[in-house]
Amino acid sequence: MVRAAVAGIAGRMGSRIAQLIRETDGIELAGGFEHSGHQAVNREISEIIGGSPTGLKVTSHIAQVLDTVDVVLDFTLAAASLEHLRQASARGKAMVIGSTGFAREQLEEAEKLAGRVPCVISPNMSMGVNVLFKVVGDVARLLGESFDVEIIEAHHRLKKDAPSGTALKLAQVAAGALGRNLEEVGVYARRGLIGERTGNEIGIQTIRGGDIVGEHTVMFAGSGERIEIVHRAQSRDNFARGAIRAALWVVRQPPGLYGMDHVLGMK
């Protein structure tokens, strides 16, 4: 039985992951924590996520749960997730991280820390989106330079980072397939008299509003035709179930940094 703790257990993703862990065979909820001062701290976990009593209280620090768990699932913020990985790696505990907004230097540190423990980091853990990553790469390679690539993403009004980690990954996949460097060709906003679109641009545009769970459209626009590939998430359960699948997988792996393509056997 895999024993799991959930970071940010009172949040939208954290609470749903915790709920689904309790419904999934082979894994049990063994802890949950929030940042110091959060109103959920010291409350029974079931008061936060619902269901029958767990016998566990929400703690205020990852260190308070590490001794009793095998893996930590973390959908918080990039800086918090990196600090949690520092502590988990020092104690030999696996991690699954779905936080987005990592800077390059943060990802570089995460890769070094993953030399001590197995860790899955992915901006999106749904099966559909990970298939989308592969499809976009394949389509970009097939169409080549004659089609322009544009990515549009939409999320709920409370999402803090933009563009989404998924949109950035889609852009990176397309850029890689076309032999481009996203840092050089990515365009994140257009306004005013900007002139003609350059041939190498990859556009990434952001929408925020309402309670949109997540929507990503990748457009390949050519002369006289275009292809649009769309993924719409209708529930956070897709992400939560993917994270649990990753947790069950990662505890059996050697130290290293993995993605959902590894978990799903796509790489």
From Swiss-Prot:
One cellular-component annotation, GO: cytosol
PROSITE patterns in the record: DAPB (PS01298)
Keyword NADP recorded: yes
One GO biological process term: lysine biosynthetic process via diaminopimelate
Enzyme nomenclature, EC number: 1.17.1.8
Entry keywords, A to Z: Amino-acid biosynthesis, Cytoplasm, Diaminopimelate biosynthesis, Lysine biosynthesis, NAD, NADP, Oxidoreductase
Active site: 155 (proton donor/acceptor), 159 (proton donor)
Enzymatic class: oxidoreductase
Keyword Oxidoreductase: yes
Pathway(s) served: Amino-acid biosynthesis; L-lysine biosynthesis via DAP pathway; (S)-tetrahydrodipicolinate from L-aspartate: step 4/4
Record's subcellular location: Cytoplasm
Binding annotation for NAD(+): 8-13, 34, 98-100, 122-125
Binding of (S)-2,3,4,5-tetrahydrodipicolinate, residues: 156, 165-166
Pfam families: DapB_C (PF05173), DapB_N (PF01113)
Reactions this protein catalyses: (S)-2,3,4,5-tetrahydrodipicolinate + NAD(+) + H2O = (2S,4S)-4-hydroxy-2,3,4,5-tetrahydrodipicolinate + NADH + H(+); (S)-2,3,4,5-tetrahydrodipicolinate + NADP(+) + H2O = (2S,4S)-4-hydroxy-2,3,4,5-tetrahydrodipicolinate + NADPH + H(+)
GO molecular function: 4-hydroxy-tetrahydrodipicolinate reductase; NAD binding; NADP binding; oxidoreductase activity, acting on CH or CH2 groups, NAD or NADP as acceptor
Family from the record: Belongs to the DapB family.
Stored NCBIfam families: dapB (TIGR00036)
PANTHER family xref list: 4-HYDROXY-TETRAHYDRODIPICOLINATE REDUCTASE 1, CHLOROPLASTIC-RELATED, DIHYDRODIPICOLINATE REDUCTASE
Function, as annotated: Catalyzes the conversion of 4-hydroxy-tetrahydrodipicolinate (HTPA) to tetrahydrodipicolinate.
Entry protein name: 4-hydroxy-tetrahydrodipicolinate reductase
Organism listed in the record: Syntrophobacter fumaroxidans (strain DSM 10017 / MPOB)
